[in-house]
Amino acid sequence: SDEEIGSNTSRALIEQEALKSQVVLVPEPAAPHTGALKTARKGVGKFSIQIKGKAAHAGQDHQDGISAIQEMAHQILFLHSLTDYELDTTLNVGVVRGGSGLNVVAEQAELNVDLRISQFGEGERV
């Protein structure tokens, strides 16, 4: 299959090839807690989002700053709201970075996102 270069699914190809075979080896490990066999995998998207604000001294010029971290907090809440357990779609912000010092309104922030989908349309929705 062309899984590594971006196929939407290789299930049809696997089923077609399986009809010609007596034995099939699947090198995918079983579920860790139950030992259940894998019959499908979620699609994966990994994203890095950069946010730019405006630095300012937190004590003297706070009002002149635009906090990239504050904006990042809003974005994280929004991104997590896209999770839909009924559609088996999960979105996780797993890594965040930002700021340059305790007394500086953060000029930059970055977050890393992991998206998992089971249905093709979910990629478009998210």
Please tell me what each predicted stretch does.
Residues 29-34, 39, 45-126:
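Metal-dependent amide/peptide-bond hydrolase catalytic core
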Residues 1-40:
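Acidic/histidine-rich catalytic neighborhood of metal-dependent amide-processing enzymes
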